[in-house]
Amino acid sequence: MKRILLSLLLLISSLFSQSLLNKDTRIINENKGVILFFESDSCPYCKILKKDFLENKEMNAIAKKFNIYLINITEEKNYIVGKKKRKETTTSLRMAFASKASPNIVMFDKKWNKIFQIPGYADPKQMTTFMKFVQGLNEGKYKATQWKNFLKDNGIS
């Protein structure tokens, strides 16, 4: 009985955490930063990065302050983006951000300004630092021009 209850609790918590990484085709900011996570099914680093988002405590905590959208580059879908409900496809988004490989992360502040684009895998320390800067922009703590110093001060060069 305990085993069944424990398994059920783990399943529920796993399903709850998956909601952090959104596969929705309506991409909105809801007054948060936005992360577009270009992935593919055959990408081992995408799997590692998704696991980092869900299991690394510090990264998970800051990630909850963003709307994160998974965009599978091998699946052609139609997307509705932002308040203006701009219509995009997987291909048009890939072309707009020159996303030829995966993972490819594109981070926006809450005003839809592109702040960072990270091609390839970034470990939890790096990813957390990038997200902290964008969150600081959203909270008015930093100006976009301060990104180089912020990254350097936080061990990212």
Predicted regions and their residues:
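Sec-dependent N-terminal signal peptides
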Residues: 4-13
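Short active-site neighborhood of thiol/selenol oxidoreductases, capturing the structured segment around
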Residues: 30-43
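C-type cytochrome heme c attachment motif
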Residues: 41-48, 103-106
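Typically the conserved alpha-helix immediately C-terminal to a functionally engaged Cys/Sec
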Residues: 47-62
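Thiol-based oxidoreductase modules, predominantly thioredoxin-like and allied folds used
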Residues: 62-87
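A short, hydrophobic beta-strand/beta-hairpin element that forms part of a small beta-sheet core
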Residues: 93, 101-117
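Non-globular targeting/processing and membrane-anchoring segments
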Residues: 97-100, 115-124, 128-157
